[in-house]
Regions:
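PLP-dependent amino-acid enzyme catalytic core
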Residues: 2-456, 463-523
């Protein structure tokens, strides 16, 4: 999705005369370079060739904590009054902000307390405590941790270091914009920026639009956590549903953008682009191929957005396009999932469900019909005396015409269902083909997103109660904060509406898949 927010000259003038002057001054006064490095701006030759446009990477993954977040945290903390610094600071975060605050505190000798949810992985807790910060585990989600941080600040007189909604944090992040204008050529056309709470895009936009107003500022969000896109559409900050918030790009999965960032963004952002999980995974690979660095999903948003934005422009885009690679703090366990989704994101793998006759020789005939195609996946299990269902993965060149010809050719002989964008097929069915069950007559099928923490499944089952019988269950760890579960439930006399209502009450994000064609073919 691409959403353009048109700037009026009046809005820009107002921003320049009011807010922009304040932020430019703060950015220029941000004395952070004894801890923060001016990250390199490097060319991405493979991406530039692929897209037919100049692509530059602003390498914030090169910071000591592998993220830009240290800029804002340090800029705020270095200006604290002596008494406040002696008492210490507190922040609620399990990610890059926590590491930024911890590093700044270690450098300045300021006591740091970080509040994290009880389900925070040990690797994240250890990374923060290794820098001398005190880690407190409280609550099951960010809201719980944040509330406890506020309580600690009041009781102990600690200073809260917010992740994005503070002038000094915004100014610290804005030094990236200052650096880009110093490093980039005069042909700079656009800057692509990942958006979570909005501090980064607010800081960069406020500086760049004042100095080089012709440079486009384009924000990029994951489709399932597009808080800034929705806010700019509505003309006000909106709060995304906790159940609907997609955590794949967890570094930018924020329910509501900040007040200050929104005020700047609605005047200084030219467009917002939203990208899918598969597009993010493909962007991670693109960055790897040019840099040999594996960045985190949030860090690849800018490239995913750039790849989506460029082909949609009515005119060829000249000049350089800068993508801010915001971070590279990725859990190793996530790489398998990212690798699997990358081919789909690049449109280099086509996933199909094909029905062939269940009789001797039909399997051979089907393979001959495929010809010399490069097969990436082939799943089959006997389940019906009359017809067989094959889950087929085929490598393609990514061109829609090639895909269309292949489906048309197979479709002349067999019923074919395209499953490449079918989340049920991609996340679950391809890993569990085993034949359809004829023993269950009334079954409802759901995809459920479970938090990866002890007791999550038990909470789900207890919330479901004893009215329902589980007829199917599939779980696969993806190395993220949330696991994906496919569950079949034999419907009792309570009925479908009552079952959906019960699931909503449990509070986990879910999707009903009872009518999904992949289910009809394989489950």
């Amino acid at each position: 999705m691409l959403w353009v927010y048109k700037l009026s000259l009046k809005c820009v003038d107002e921003l320049q005369s009011n807010e922009m002057d304040k932020y430019i001054r703060k950015i220029l006064e941000a004395d952070i370079y004894d801890l923060v490095q001016m990250s390199p701006l490097t060319k991405a030759p493979r991406l530039s060739s692929k897209l037919g446009a100049g692509v530059m990477l602003k390498r914030e993954d090169q910071q000591e904590i592998f993220s830009f977040k240290v800029r804002g945290a340090y800029n705020l903390m270095r200006q604290m009054p002596r008494d406040a610094a002696r008492r210490g600071v507190v922040a609620a975060s399990a990610g890059n902000h926590a590491q930024g605050v911890a590093l700044a505190g270690q450098h300045l000798g300021i006591p740091v307390t970080i509040v994290m949810g009880v389900n925070t992985p040990a690797i994240k807790r250890d990374a923060v405590s290794a820098r001398g910060a005190t880690v407190i585990l409280r609550g099951e989600n960010f809201d719980d941790a944040s509330a406890h941080a506020v309580t600690l600040a009041k009781v102990k007189g600690l200073t809260i270091v917010p992740p994005f909604d503070h002038d000094d944090v915004i100014a610290g992040q804005g030094t990236i914009g200052m650096e880009i204008l110093r490093q980039a050529s005069s042909s700079l056309n656009a800057i692509f920026i990942p958006v979570g709470g909005g501090g980064l895009i607010a800081g960069v936009a406020s500086y760049v639009k004042a100095i080089r107003p012709g440079v486009k500022i384009i924000g990029v969000e994951a489709e399932g956590s597009a808080g800034m896109t929705e806010a700019l559409k509505a003309g006000r900050r909106v709060k995304l549903s906790a159940q609907a918030l997609d955590q794949f790009a967890d570094g930018t999965a924020v329910r509501q953008v900040g007040t200050r960032p929104f005020q700047i963004a609605k005047q200084a952002v030219d467009a917002m682009v939203t990208v899918s999980v598969d597009e993010i995974c493909a962007a991670i690979k693109d960055i790897f191929e040019d840099t040999r660095v594996l960045c985190e999903p949030a860090g690849a948003l800018s490239i995913a957005g750039l790849k989506k934005w460029l082909p949609r422009q009515p005119q060829p885009q000249r000049g350089d396009h800068v993508a801010v690679v915001s971070g590279a703090n990725i859990n190793f366990d996530r790489l398998r999932h990212i690798s699997e989704r990358t081919a789909l994101g690049e449109k280099k793998e086509l996933l199909l469900g094909v029905t062939i006759p269940e009789r001797p020789g039909s399997f051979l005939s089907f393979c001959r019909a495929l010809g010399r195609l490069s097969i990436t996946e082939f799943n089959y299990r006997y389940a019906d005396p009359g017809e067989a269902h094959v889950l087929l993965g085929v490598e393609t060149d990514g061109l829609p015409a090639t895909e269309h010809r292949l489906i048309e050719r197979l479709g002349r002989r067999y019923p074919v269902t395209r499953l490449s964008e079918n989340e049920l097929a991609v996340l679950h069915v391809r890993h569990m083909v085993g034949g359809r069950s004829t023993a269950i007559e009334k079954e409802q099928l759901y995809r459920v997103e479970f938090p990866e923490r002890p007791g999550a499944l038990l909470k789900f089952l207890e919330g479901l109660g004893s009215d329902y019988n589980i007829s199917l269950f599939h779980y696969r760890n993806h190395g993220s904060a949330f696991g994906r579960v496919l569950i079949g439930i034999e419907r009792s006399s309570a009925g479908r509406q009552a079952l959906s209502s019960r699931l909503r009450d449990i509070g986990y994000r879910f999707w009903e898949e009872s009518a999904n064609p992949a289910r009809d073919l394989f489950l």
